[in-house]
A protein has these predicted regions:
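Intrinsically disordered, low-complexity regulatory segments
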Residues: 1-179
């Protein structure tokens, strides 16, 4: 069985550019394949923090007496309109012939969170690498793939983005319902 490395970009257009440079030119359902690579994509945030009523059905109705809403254990959920692409990514990540997963989402906090949310919800245990590029020029892409870093080097960015998301959620849910 041939071995593959899976690359996940933030959006289809970026995935197509990356795939062209690394030789993954065969179109499949939700990804491209070739030259030992599979390249797929998120469509922005495929997953996000669960709505308040996911934590307790009583939060479906807005009541002042229920404030503040402070989840003890945060839940990430896949958006209903994004389930198909998530399922494709989950299947690809956990395929037995995939040896590692490369996060090629945008270089920054949100790109890190977009990828990590999918990686974690898919319960992927494969080694994770990070493609960090600031240009879509072919030479920059080749250089980026030649210098992949361990995904764990970017844990701080994921943590920062997740803290921002939780803070937005807390302020948004509680302040909106308060006023």
């Amino acid at each position: 069985m041939a071995q593959h490395k899976l690359v996940i970009a933030e959006k289809p257009s970026v995935a197509q550019n990356l795939a062209a440079v690394i030789g993954a030119t065969v179109r499949k359902d939700g990804y491209l394949e070739g030259n030992g690579w599979r390249v797929s994509w998120c469509v922005g945030h495929l997953a996000g923090l669960a709505d308040a009523d996911s934590y307790d059905p009583k939060y479906a109705k807005w009541r002042y007496d229920d404030l503040p809403i402070l989840p003890e254990h945060w839940q990430m959920v896949v958006g209903k309109d994004k389930k198909k692409q998530f399922d494709i990514l989950k299947k690809l990540m956990n395929a037995p012939d995939v040896t590692e997963v490369v996060n090629a989402c945008d270089a920054g906090r949100e790109g890190e969170l977009i990828f990590r949310s999918v990686y974690e919800l898919a319960d992927c245990q494969k080694p994770m690498k990070r493609l960090w590029i600031s240009s879509m020029e072919d030479s920059a892409i080749r250089e980026g793939f030649a210098n992949l870093r361990p995904g764990a080097d970017y844990d701080g960015l994921r943590d920062a983005a997740l803290c921002r998301a939780k803070a937005d959620w807390l302020v948004g849910i509680n302040a909106t319902r308060l006023f």
